[in-house]
Amino acid sequence: MRPLFRRLLGGVAIAAALYSCASVGRIEGGPYDETPPRFISGTPTPGALHHNKNKLSIEFDEFIKLDKPNEKIVISPPQVQQPEIKSNGKKVVITLQDTLKPNTTYTFDFGDAIQDNNEGNPLENFFYSFSTGDRLDSMAVAGTVLNAANLEPVKGMLVGLHANLADSAFTKLPFERVGRTDSRGRFSIRGVAPGKYRIYALQDADQNFAYSQPTEVIAFNDSIIIPSMEERMRQDTTWIDSLTVDTIVERQYTHYLPDDVLLRAFKELSFSQRFLKAERLTPEKFSLYFTAPADTLPLLKGLNFNEEDAFVIEQPTGRNDTIHYWIKDSLLYKQDSLKMSITYLYTDSLKQLVPRTDTLNVLAKLTYDKQQKQKQEAKEKEQKEREKKKKKLKEGEVEEPEPTEFLAVDVYAPSAIDVYDYLTLSFTEPVASIDTAAFHLKQKVDSLWQDIPFDFMRDSLDLKRYNLFAEWAPGESYTFEVDSAAIRGLYGLFSDKIKKDFKAKKLEEYGQIFFNVHGADSLAFVELLDGQDKVLRTVPVVDGKADFYFLNPGKYGARLINDTNGNGVWDTGNYAEKRQPEMVYYYPMVLELKANFDLTQEWDIKAKSLDRQKPDELKKQKPDEDKKKQNRNKNNRSGNSSRNSGRGHSY
């Protein structure tokens, strides 16, 4: 590239974005403006050298407004102090608060922030550059940031370059050049000088342009980035009218590389363990909350009570970060105040887990006396209602008996049960005893009900939930009955009688999906997803196959996780260890399964790049609505229009 052309390219390159495709058509109600603002002039001029003033002024051909300027306008090098950005009539004025750096190219990437004042037509991909030295750096690096766990495009994430190739640069120094991802996860870092770089992505919570907080989402690339450029040719088309081509012209343009950098964003596991709070909403239960999981339960010592065999301990997450203590003894839960010491593992200033003891005074938000008063008031109110109804009874009508308070039980037993499913009994408090001899599960055989065997056990994650397993014969009818008083709760209430009738689905109501997987690691599993990207089932990949049986008709997606450590779950990354998150791949289509059908799909997990794998139907991060005003009737378009603006370069 000739030196003069290279020097002017970065500044004059705005012409690539200035004259975007525009046409004027006529519809009912008159002409509709689709034309974005056009650049007229600027101070300094585009590509100016040796510029040393902090103010930038850009003028357009019409009145303009700015859409989310602090979010959409990206300035390189990044500014520590927030610049002042405002629109004034036909001008955009930016005043930098930081001192200008010597021999540095400054780039202002406006994205689609500049819009005409009336219709909101955006001037897309507009950027502006000047240099404080005698050279204007003009190369660019582009790519995509995806959520490493689910390949969702990450919007609004900062992406930056470091010429300092040391690992510590990301954690100690601000980025040298930056870009920001759009709604498709795409980014472009402009005004880059020749050289070698490391590239990172960062959700910059403290706005210091460095990875300084463990809660920040990050991404890093294992490879060194070396920007380059090449000349390419493309065809531009001019039109006589909406249907007739005038001329097809080949134009040369400069393309910047790399343009396909892929960054997989993740948040590191936080190992900062500390006690968060104690809570006692009701007299019978108090809870301890910690900021992170622990391998062991805290050691609890009662100071105004005996803690031995005093509680039923519930761990709803199974990870010891939330612990519920159900108090067994009525004398104990009648106390308004429970004083105790707890010893637990705490993360010290050296990031080491050490024992720590805190003293707590856990007060009941609802005291026992107040609870009993509320119950008595509710009972008296109910009694008054009963007295009113009694007075209205007609001769011969029988008064309803006073209701008995039973242990609350929620029974999951759908009327049409899946052949692989099971029944569930959920309680509002721990269970003290269960008499399974009072449980009766029967199958209808030739019009007669016959007892069938079942397994009944407590759920492994929830001590207040119990599951009943049996072999359901497809298409057959069942009844499940529990005698009254078969179950006693921790606080003395008994269950009412239970009766549920249901029928197992027929095999022809199901379909199957079989994946023949190519390219997966030796340890991998596939998650079957619903239309909202939620996991329905998980199966391991065995001999290159992942099979899903007994599926209800519907739409399904699938993702594969290369399970590097073989623990059966997706694992995040760690920057200090230079460990990337485990790889995730999506089957690139949503499958529609019909009843009584089998689908066999060949799946080469690397056939498409990661940014093209996840089906749009499963994405939660949708592309922003195109703000360009589309012609409402292409057949009525009048006059000549250029479908291609003849841009001289691309990113």
Predicted feature residues:
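N-terminal targeting or signal-anchor segments and their processing/structural boundaries
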Residues: R2-Y651
